Swiss-Prot record:
The gene is pgk. This is Phosphoglycerate kinase. It comes from Kineococcus radiotolerans (strain ATCC BAA-149 / DSM 14245 / SRS30216). Monomer. The keyword ATP-binding applies. InterPro entries: Phosphoglycerate_kinase (IPR001576), Phosphoglycerate_kinase_CS (IPR015911), Phosphoglycerate_kinase_N (IPR015824), Phosphoglycerate_kinase_sf (IPR036043). Belongs to the phosphoglycerate kinase family.
Length: 412
């Protein structure tokens, strides 16, 4: 992949050049809370902060930076709740001394005029790219036509939205075919980290998987047990997905989340792990509640004694300690998915135990985006206490599955 330095050389410098940057600014918003300007409150600005170094590098070199990004999943038309206006306000705060403008459209005469008005070292954020049907269209002609409009706004393209590189979208894939291009610093770092996880990881290698559904992790488990993990490595499973693992081994799980259609496949994972010498670590106790609510009656119970009228919402304290012990001497750790419903304090302790184990251990630890990143920040852990916090949940998983990611392939 070309770097920013390569692109700067190719262009003869960034000064005066219009550079279209595809960033990942897809941050969580709390629409029930408002800031001083009346905008929804951003609850985790990690992706914004991760985007700043690439933007600052271009701005300091005199580029006229045009940023495009998505927020949420609008259906190809404007929806007020998905506007990037709150993101614009926070981005301006993160770039002091920079003129940061906002354009309420993405392409067309208004966008062209706004880009033309930029001076060297200024930035323009375009409105949500997914307000345009062409961005995500499965029709190649429609998507490519939209990419033509985007490319007309710039002299070069920088791909820095790692969280979207697994999508064959106009602003991720097609624009790169139309302009001189390079990977931004964030994308380059993410790829370097993932290569470290897949090429020659230090061992013992421990992978911690959580989240609600095992069906969301099938591809990555297939690849982990098929090639990445070997004898002496560990696969630790928690979160809602663990109840399918427990049921596959004969345990009753009450009203806990269960994917009955995956039981046979999960039973196969258990056998494969045993045959390969991969230690499969499952909880021995869980926090079982009468309802999915923070104030519901709840108790710690053994996994062989989950009441029929209760659902598991976190791994228990004994399991948290056991997980921490299996992570203590690991040399490489990848973690994707919380151990419980961390947003509710009674069910946050398992996730906290895993996070603390990574902080205390000596492994190169990677927190795999999405809910995992939100969890560690919500629980008060600083980013720098981990080896790397990825900005790409789905993209990271697909990379670990061994899939080709369109947004990376086009940069190669």
């Amino acid at each position: 992949m070309k770097t920013l330095d390569d692109l700067e050389t190719q262009l003869g410098g960034f000064a005066g050049r219009r550079v279209l940057v595809r960033s990942d600014l897809n941050v969580p918003l709390d629409h029930d809370r408002r800031d001083g300007a009346g905008q929804p409150v951003i609850t985790d600005d990690g992706r914004l902060r991760a985007s700043v170094p690439t933007l600052r590098r271009l701005l300091d070199a005199g580029a006229r930076v045009v940023v495009t990004a998505h927020l949420g999943r609008p259906k190809g038309a404007p929806e007020a709740k998905y506007s990037l206006a709150p993101v614009h306000a926070r981005l301006a705060e993160l770039l002091p001394g920079v003129e940061v403008g906002f354009c309420p459209v993405t392409v067309g005469a208004q966008a062209t005029a706004a880009v033309d008005a930029l001076a060297d070292g200024e930035l323009l954020l375009l409105e949500n790219i997914r307000f345009n049907a062409g961005e995500t269209s499965k029709d190649d002609e429609e998507r490519e036509a939209f990419a033509d409009e985007l490319a007309a706004l710039a002299d070069a393209f920088v791909s820095d939205g790692f969280g979207a590189v697994h999508r064959k979208h106009a602003s991720v894939y097609d624009v790169a075919l139309r302009l001189p291009h390079a990977a931004g610093g964030l994308v380059a770092t993410e790829v370097e980290v993932l290569q470290r996880l897949t090429a020659h990881p230090e061992r013992p290698y421990a992978v911690v998987l959580g989240g609600s559904k095992v069906s969301d992790k099938l591809g990555v488990i297939d690849n982990l047990l098929g090639s990445l993990l070997g004898e002496g490595d560990r696969l630790l499973v928690g979160g809602g997905m663990v109840f399918t693992f427990l049921k596959a081994q004969g345990y009753e799980v009450g009203k806990s989340l269960l994917e009955t259609d995956q039981l046979d496949r999960v039973a196969g994972y258990v056998r494969t792990a045993r045959e390969k010498g991969v230690e499969l670590v499952l909880p021995t106790d869980v926090v079982a509640a009468t309802a999915f609510a923070a104030d519901a009656e709840h108790d710690v119970v053994a996994v062989d004694a989950i009441p029929a009228d209760r659902l598991g919402l976190d791994i228990g304290p004994d399991s948290g300690a056991a997980f921490a012990a299996r992570l203590a001497d690991a040399r490489t750790v990848f973690w994707n998915g919380p151990m419980g419903v961390f947003e509710m304090e009674p069910y946050s302790h398992g996730t906290r135990a895993v996070a603390q184990a990574l902080v205390d251990g000596g492994a190169f630890s990677v927190v795999g985006g999405g809910d995992s990143a939100a969890a560690v920040r919500t629980l008060g852990f600083a980013d720098e206490r981990f080896g790397h916090i990825s900005t790409g949940g789905g993209a990271s998983l697909e990379y670990l599955e061994g899939k080709h990611l369109p947004g990376l392939d086009v940069l190669s």
